[in-house]
Amino acid sequence: RLGDGAGSGKVVAPENSLTPENDLAAEKVVAAENGAQSLTLQYLRGERPRYSRSKRTPNYFIKVEGAMEHNLKDIDVAFPLNTLTVVTGVSGSGKSSLVGDILYRAMFRHLNETGEAPGTFRALSGSLDRISQVEYVDQNPIGRSSRSNAVTYLKIYDDIRKLLSEQPYAKMNGYGPAHFSFNQEGGRCPECQGDGFVRIGMQFMADVTMTCEACGGKRFKPDILEVRYRGCNVDDILNMSVSEAIDFFSSDDNPSAQRITARLKTLVDVGLSYIKLGQSSSTLSGGESQRIKLAYYLSMTQNRDSVRPERILFIFDEPTTGLHFYDVEKLLRSFDVLLSKGHSIVVVEHNPDVIRAADWVLDLGPDAGDNGGELVFAGTPEELVAQGNTFTAKYL
């Protein structure tokens, strides 16, 4: 087992621990020798309490009437607003058909009068006027270009370029923010065009990528790399981890540096303190991409001037995929920030910790395929457990 903390890369339990009992025992010994127990061990032994949310009571709903897409059996489903609603059920019970194919597409068409046709249903009703935007936060890459990364997606790089352009050497040579862009001619390496690598086409094999010989993988011209902000050039900054960059920028009172720090902290909030600022989006996992998108919306809530008056309906499809127990806590805290701003969240999820933390549960079933497609429960997690006759209830 690896730990302790994101980006550490330390082995805290040996690979020859073949049983759960041995694994836990070995990990405890190793962790004790290091002066602390690993987070994994604390969660598995029940020594660390699960995150406890302040539950919200639903007052307004959006109702999907007559949902009949795929195996859905003409069901009416009410989705609460300004709450964390978790849609549960065994695989194949109809969750994605209901939430992705019907709710999301129907809401998008209602709000934008365009978009992909929703799945089969009769009507959309309820407090539709209380939602002015719908966002499906999926695990698709955050950008199609190899030059896209977390700081470009969160608009952090704009302030980084501005800071660099304000340095004496940059002013002396007439370098503006555009000279520190990957996407514009001027400062980027002309050989690799800001990628830091070149791609060599192979006729009968996959293309090969090699570090750009002209810039040595640094992406920019030598003169641009001479510009330094607090001793670091643009390449140094892009190679910092999120946590390193927060330490670096937070001690500067410059408004741009403070904005950078605030937005970087949203990446920490979603468990991404370890990624490099300039790390290409093509190297990020689907779960990491999804959490960067969540961080973007969290950053919108920081500055009142940037927060639009809309109340957004956020839809997530299994956001805990690949997450440690500790990261699930961070995810739930991030959800609470969005809810506190008046937004609404619907999550398709199997993770018991998320289901327990929900304000409202919509359980589909009772089984999969032709034996699924029914709404077998709607209510709080506590009511679901008390009812006790669905697969989800039994596992909770």
PLM segments and residue spans:
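Conserved phosphate-binding elements of NTP-dependent enzyme cores
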Residues: 1-396
